[in-house]
Amino acid sequence: MLKHDLDYLELLSESFPTATEVATEIINLEAILNLPKGTEHFLADIHGEYEAFIHVLKNASGSIRRKVDEVFGGQLRQNQKRELCTLIYYPREKLELVKQSDERMEDWYMVTLNQLIKVCQKAAEKYTRSKVRKTLPPKYSYIIQELLHEDGVNPNKSAYISSIFSSIISTGCADDFIIAISETIQRLVIDHLHVVGDVFDRGPGAHIIMDTLMKYHHFDIQWGNHDMLWMGAAVGNASCMANVVRIALRYANLDTLESGYGINLLPLARFAMDTYADDPCTVFKPKLAQADQTYDDKSVYLISQMHKAISIIQFKLEHQIIARHPEYKMDNRDLFHLVNFTDGTIKLSSGVYPMLDMNFPTVDPADPYALTEQEQNIVDRLMGCFMRSEKLQNHLKCLYRHGSMYLTYNMNLLYHASIPLNKDKSLKKVRVGDKTYAGRELLDKVEEMIRTAYVAPEKSDQRLAAVDYMWYLWCGPDSPLFDKAMMTTFERYFIEDKATHHEEKGYYYVYRQEKAVCEMILKEFGLEGPDTHIINGHVPVKAKKGELPIGAEGKLMLIDGGFSKAYQSSTGIAGYTLIFNSQGLHLVQHEPFSSTRKAIEEMEDIKSITVVREVTSHRMLVKDTDNGHLLSKQVENLKKLLQAYSYGLIKERKK
């Protein structure tokens, strides 16, 4: 045995000072290694739609309903199963409804407690008792463990269980216990959650989603383009901040900004009302759902004015970054100087086009990108709100702690949008700073820049460059989070000809349906074999046009969650989520979610069907997972320590 091995084993012996303790730990770890792997849940492109997100989280993309079916089969009617599932999803709210309609609560409690324990037993069966114990609420841990490990078929045990239930009911703890056991089931059904990008966007509750994630037991995030926009704003990028505010106003979603993060929009509102007092702001009218009665005409007009004001500010701020970074090669996004302020047209490389709006009181034709003093004041005040928002900064910290550009996890490669490619399908070399990078090196360098924007000394050149780069990640042509020739925001506002709105996608989107390309990308990230996959979001799958969520002969899984209601008319569905358990991958297609109220009162669940079921080459055990490989290494080292004790190379220390 080599000296450095002995040095390490000496350290290990401090944790396991006797051969008996080593042997016990080996037995425990090998038992864990031979259990079925935990269930992973993959979601992407939530876009601030918190109600649908929370429901999918609670029902685990149909996993809880499947557990209920497995336990009760034909013993319960469909309506009874729906009622039980609703109770597990929303225990507090459902209990209130039951109390209003059921006078025989003691009988209901007895039946329900029995049903919940059976579902919990099913959810816990693949885990060690130790792991289950850690998921239990401390105040009920002992009693739930007793119930989980008792067999109700035995008459003596059945009486014992009934006596426990009676005690729970008679002491007035039934409601609290039902809530605790329901939330335990939710935790046990999903072992790990992957959010493959875009928590943020136009939906009303990104802050609620982040609050929910921060309380979740195990999760990770692969940053999306909208996440990067908010992260950029939160670290001090004014262009990112202006984009965030513009998008919120474009979709009349002010809840996240004002209620969620305490961003004061009043200075912007006053400025917009004064500056655009006689301007109809027609092209800046917010996009409202047909049934949206939230805003009256006066409010819609004010939002339109604010929308125009921040859009003009955004275009000016973006010019500053483009001017500071010629290496971005984004001069084609500076368009104000191409406007003919005399005849109301704009000259692009593709032709001359009439402008839909020519009222620009804050734009000086001789210096179109200069911010007025008032505009600069608005930027400073808004930026101050973003930087001082305690909740936003806490959420930013969470995004950094749990987030990354990509993740390799249990033979799957997760990233939100793209791996830039050349026309010949090779990995594209992209400039970041002074050097070029491709593939995995590119994503590693990009992540380094993102983290530098957060941790480097304030006002250092390193930090300022990294903060600017976060805006490039939002809309830069070679950004792995965007990967399109250009973002045509200006054209969409001011030019009617839709040909100018086109955003040419990078070659990744052209070639990602080819198996060889996906295998090349997987290999670049160290993954090879029949059970490897790319899990991708970002681009909605248009199911009603025949598009499929699986490509490259099974190597590519597209799970744009379709939570954004704006896309549901074009996709025909509410997107896809993915479940990966010990049997394999289950790609689940969802119908649109109505509301939390309907889910509780009418027991309306999201209609979901498994559209792809890919069985792994063998039932996956813990030892087949990334964590299992680490545990196997621990076992290997413990066996060496046991051998060292046996041969007297290391002396046992009695306690």
From Swiss-Prot:
Name of the top EC class for this enzyme: hydrolase
Organism placement in taxonomy: Bacteria, Pseudomonadati, Bacteroidota, Bacteroidia, Bacteroidales
Reaction(s) the record says it catalyses: beta-D-fructose 1,6-bisphosphate + H2O = beta-D-fructose 6-phosphate + phosphate
Manganese as UniProt keyword: yes
Cofactors demanded by this protein: Mn(2+)
Keywords: Carbohydrate metabolism, Hydrolase, Manganese
Cross-referenced InterPro entries: FBPtase_class3, Metallo-depent_PP-like
Entry keyword Hydrolase: yes
Pfam families: FBPase_2 (PF06874)
EC numbers for this chain: 3.1.3.11
Name of the featured protein: Fructose-1,6-bisphosphatase class 3
GO molecular function ontology, one term from the record: fructose 1,6-bisphosphate 1-phosphatase activity
Any Gene Ontology biological process: gluconeogenesis
Superkingdom, taxonomy of origin: Bacteria
Pathway: Carbohydrate biosynthesis; gluconeogenesis
Similarity comment text for this entry: Belongs to the FBPase class 3 family.
